[in-house]
Amino acid sequence: MLLRGPYPNLHLQKELCGKAAYDLVLTITSSKEMLYDNIATSDTLVSGLGAYRPVIVEVGPGIVEGSMCVVDDPVGAPVKAGDIIQAGKNWSQVGSLADHLTGTPREMVSVFFKSVGCAARDLAACGVAMAGMIELG
């Protein structure tokens, strides 16, 4: 285990060779080489939070092509989401997080969530921070 914390059921570990079951695979790097690829399964949510430029890739084509891809910014993703760009996924098969959350739930499918950053979310966070500062005086 890499990290111990206040959550006894949360175990952070390096990827093991061979087959291993993970609930969540989370990548947050600026790697230019693929860090994780496996057969996509509905048991594991893969979330790519790095790779925000076309030349950066964390998650490989096995996951991207084998998963329902959901992005936080459907306008920015086609020019920023290196994992999806390099895998050659058809953009008509990539959905937005907003549509995914408000739509009808699908049967169990593998999901790859890709975040490239979203200025609207950043602006909302700034608004909350500013309101807190004003309240504190």
Q: Which role does the model predict for each range below?
A:
Residues M1-P6:
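Phosphate/pyrophosphate-binding betaalpha-module
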Residues Y7-I84:
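Rossmann-like adenosine-cofactor binding region
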Residues P54-G137:
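Adenosine-phosphate binding glycine-rich loop
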